[in-house]
Amino acid sequence: MRTISPASIRQHFARAVMPLVVFLLLLAGGVYATNYSLWINGRSSTAQPGNHADFTYWGPASTAAGVNKKSVNWDGFSRVSDQNYRVRDALDCYCTGTNWCYIAAHSAGNLQIGYALSLYGGTARSKKNATPNASGVCGNSDGGTQTGWNIKWVNVAAGAGGGSELANVGSWAVKDPLTSDLKTATARALYDHNQTRAKWFYMYAGSKGTLYSGVLPGQDDEAVAYHSAGGVSGSGGAGFCNPSDWFCNDLTMGTAANEGGKAKWSYHSVKFRDDGEALNHYTNSAWGGVVSKVRADMAANAN
């Protein structure tokens, strides 16, 4: 019978327990990864700025919408540049250090995440502890910094990154500062839409328009046209439609150039096009409209 020496026993034991020891040390030091799902609202009169637990804008907080979901509440009223710090605070909180984020944005929330990534995604960010105070600001974790944020991808429902013709012609009977940013020429010049820091923007475009939205070119969801919701590049809007419309160039799926040759912005891909003309722009505080498609994707894949 083979005799196993005490030294050999100690060696095998050390190999067996070492992974457990390392794991426990990392756990004790708080060095473990957590994924979060951040939801960035658009125009709103109900958002509670800095309150990452309030989902009034979206719908019931109990609804599945991605792992560890947080509501990135900015005021939904001010200029993008004036409220973007709220978005950056949330990104710092949950998307630094060992933590990673999935992002979902709606309407003008598209401008907010695009603005943050383009202008601040290459800057030094302090690593945070994912424990926000009442203002939505987290404390530092280990005193270290990193460049930009840990983001897996960005889902955009009814994106207003390209602006809306309704803002151009004053169809919205409001005078809030945000409307100025939503004019098509302004929205498209607000930041470099091609600079996403290599993060993919997956676009979800609804097309249940109405007669009063006739000012919007091509297919629309009552508030934004396909040129915006589909991430079509350029300094101004143009008409893009579903394949069933013979009198308008198609908004193509994926990253391919649209019919007529117009390209999408870099790292922008159309994931959903509302060929059935069934989904409008609005959540109705019930995860409704085209947001329903993004919510379903986040519930299934943001984990």
What residues fall within each predicted segment?
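N-terminal secretory signal peptides that target proteins for export/translocation
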Residues: 1-12
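Short, solvent-exposed loop/turn segments at secondary-structure junctions
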Residues: 43-45, 110, 160-162, 208-211
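Bacterial N-terminal signal peptides
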Residues: 17-28
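Serine-dependent carboxylesterase/thioesterase catalytic core
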Residues: 35-37, 85-200
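C-terminal catalytic-base region of ester-bond hydrolases, centering on the histidine
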Residues: 195-303
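Active-site catalytic motif of lipid deacylating hydrolases and related acyltransferases
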Residues: 33-103, 162-165, 172
